[in-house]
């Protein structure tokens, strides 16, 4: 089985469209939350994911946009974008977000946005935090987003191995537990501005399973123009150009 793994699209339709066009043949698409927030096209992104039949979980920006997550910890630009998003969402988008689970598990894979443990919006940024989360889910693999940084954390011989998700890098998974982050489709923060996603390949034998990190160029100028037209914060618009 091949699963497209997307996260942190953040209402960036041109980035999502570029990823969809770049995808190899896959059996399923999983989205790890923060479908909206920051970007200018929340309704269009949600409609596109519905058309793809994507299996999604809720992120903190998704919940904040419909009032189920308190944005008290958001920075001023993020709060301003959420206020704009809340006013822009149509009825279909609100219903879609409200129905999203915080955790999704199927077979050997668990999907969350931030963390499988409390606090669920924890940022898993390094091996020590990943190690502390390994017992918080029941499956072999855990897919997560939230940090906007592509990485694979794998348990190997009692240690945590971290593979940075450079474009084209393929992490071989094996039988041990692993936590896998595809990076961000709509607002990368690893210094590369291209949309990031991954393909998880489950081959029936854990020794042959892989997680491939992929990047694709998208029309950043189009997204930035729409953000300016919407009056979204300038810093959010500008950061797309340098991937931070």
Model regions and ranges:
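Beta-strand-turn-beta hairpins that frame and shape the catalytic cleft
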Residues: 1-4, 105-111, 173-179, 209
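N-terminal active-site segment of His-dependent metallophosphoesterases
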Residues: 1-54
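Active-site neighborhood of phospho(di)ester-bond hydrolases with catalytic His/Asp-centered motifs
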Residues: 6-7, 29-34, 55-60, 112, ...
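Active-site environment of divalent metal-dependent phosphoester hydrolases
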Residues: 10-15, 37-40, 61-66, 117-119, ...
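Active-site neighborhood of divalent metal-dependent phosphoester bond hydrolases
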Residues: 45-46, 51-138
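Short beta-strand scaffold segments in enzyme catalytic cores
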Residues: 103-106, 150-154, 196-200
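Anionic-ligand binding region
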Residues: 127-170, 175-180
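Acidic, His/Gly-rich catalytic cores of divalent-metal-dependent hydrolytic chemistry
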Residues: 157-244
């Amino acid at each position: 089985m091949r699963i497209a793994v997307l996260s942190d699209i953040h209402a960036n339709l041109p980035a999502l469209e570029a990823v969809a066009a770049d995808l190899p043949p896959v059996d399923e698409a999983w989205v790890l939350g923060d479908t909206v927030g920051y970007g200018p096209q929340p309704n269009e992104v949600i409609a596109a994911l519905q058309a793809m039949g994507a299996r999604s979980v809720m992120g903190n920006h998704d919940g904040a946009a419909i009032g189920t997550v308190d944005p008290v910890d958001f920075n001023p630009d993020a709060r301003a974008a959420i206020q704009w998003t809340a006013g822009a969402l149509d009825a279909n988008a609100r219903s879609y977000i409200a129905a999203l689970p915080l955790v999704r598990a199927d077979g050997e894979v668990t999907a969350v946005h931030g963390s499988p443990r409390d606090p669920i919006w924890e940022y898993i940024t390094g091996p020590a935090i990943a190690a502390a989360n390994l017992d918080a889910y029941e499956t072999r693999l855990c897919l997560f987003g939230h940090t906007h940084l592509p990485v694979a954390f794998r348990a190997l011989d009692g240690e945590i191995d971290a593979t940075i998700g450079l474009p084209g890098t393929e992490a071989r998974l094996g039988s041990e537990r692993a936590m896998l982050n595809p990076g961000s489709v709509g607002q990368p923060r690893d210094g590369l501005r291209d949309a990031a996603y991954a393909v998880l390949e489950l081959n029936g034998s854990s020794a042959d399973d892989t997680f491939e990190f992929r990047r694709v160029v998208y029309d950043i100028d189009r997204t930035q123009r729409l953000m300016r037209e919407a009056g979204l914060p300038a810093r959010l618009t500008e950061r797309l150009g340098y991937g931070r």
